[in-house]
Amino acid sequence: MVMYDIGNSRFLKQALLVLLLTAMGMKTYAQEDHRNVVRLFRLDGSFSTELPVKISSEGKSEGFGFTLRDARLEADSMGFLTRLRSVLTIANSDAKRRITEVEWRLDVYDEALHSLSQRVLQTDKVNIYAGETGVASAKIGAVLPDRMVVLLQLIRVAFADGSAWSPMEQCSLGEDLRTISCKSK
């Protein structure tokens, strides 16, 4: 009978470390792909804070031809109404096509009640040429919670040649308001 001490095996420790780093790298890559189309924010007052999220996904992310470089939300309270402005910075990495329109969805959750308050589609006509970066923005006015968590998801990106991109998965926010699950449409 051969006894093997796993705790003292340098080779086994290195192999497990490589396996662990490889698995973590794949998970990070999958989440980074979803960051191209999904962001999560917390609003308490005027400005938003982007929240770290856990993303679970059924499918594989595809190449987009663009990157959601940055996104931010700003809120102005006007009595019982709140004006919410979303600003997206899009980088066009497609070598040939010009982006002409960006559409996104905001799912606004009441942080205190952990429930969906509003779902809003926003769109902006833009001209983002190949290799350039541009801004898409839109405003809404609605009765919104004082403290909210907002899930932003790109819905459609249209190009000048008539083609359009839309995600293969639709994402939703979990009950903990931190976990995003993406499922095939």
For each feature predicted by the language model, list its residue ranges.
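Low-complexity, acidic Ser/Thr/Pro/Gly-rich terminal tails and inter-domain linkers that flank the onset
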Residues: 31-87, 179-182
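Short, solvent-exposed, Trp/other aromatic-anchored flexible loops in extracytoplasmic proteins
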Residues: 118-164
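Hydrophobic helical h-region of N-terminal Sec-dependent signal peptides
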Residues: 16-25
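Bacterial N-terminal signal peptides that target proteins for export
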Residues: 2-16
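Sec/Tat signal peptide C-region and signal peptidase I cleavage site
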Residues: 26-30
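Short acidic, flexible loop segments centered on an aromatic residue
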Residues: 96-112
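Surface-exposed edge beta-strand/loop patches
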Residues: 109, 149-185
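Asparagine-centered strand-capping/turn motif at beta-strand->loop junctions
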Residues: 90-96
